[in-house]
Amino acid sequence: MTTVSHELDDVIHEIACVELGDDKMAFKSDPIMARFKETGTELWVDTGDLQKAKSIWKTEFTALTTNNTLANQVVQTGVVDEVIGQTVSRLKEVAPGLSEEELVTEIGFVINCRIALRLVHSFKTGVSVELHPSMSRNIERTLNYARRYYRVCPEYFTIKIPLTPEGYLAVRTLRKE
């Protein structure tokens, strides 16, 4: 599948999005991290695991970064089992013609969004989300999924695009937008 229909895209967007509350948590400062930050360094935490991030987060941290491997680790904990079940049911209802590969891709998109949105909700900071490597050689798919991630949370999501010739072309197009 190179693109998702606008109708299906709207349904997936609805499934992927969750309301963000205003309950930012308070975190402690770390003097060593403060010294790093004073040098102009931006400190990012590399995890999709909300509890792990909460246990190490300091006020000096700038953002969080996730990727497909980290998202898979979260999936293995069972935290998103309900989301997966609801997503499968809803997609089979509205798009019964999706192939297994298309269904898995869309479920992955929803899971990545939900994991990243949980982090945004808790930390009220930027979170990078990564396009799946299977899209790395297809400009149209790269553009489509990058736009879809951006649509979910433009204020907080940074979209990581695979470093391929097609990725460079996609970035050039997206920067113009």
Regions found by a protein language model. Name each.
Residues 24, 28, 37, 52-54, ...:
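Context-gated lysine
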Residues 7-11, 31-32, 52, 82-86, ...:
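Exposed alpha-helical structural elements
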Residues 31-64, 69-73:
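Glycine-rich, flexible N-terminal cofactor/catalytic loop recognition
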Residues 28-37, 120, 150, 171-177:
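Surface-exposed amphipathic alpha-helices with a cationic face
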Residues 18-23, 38-42, 54, 111-117, ...:
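Short, functional N-terminal and low-complexity linear motifs
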Residues 2-48:
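N- or domain-start disorder-to-order transition segments that initiate the globular core
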Residues 60-61, 68-171:
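Active-site beta->alpha loop and helix N-cap motifs at the rims of alpha/beta catalytic domains
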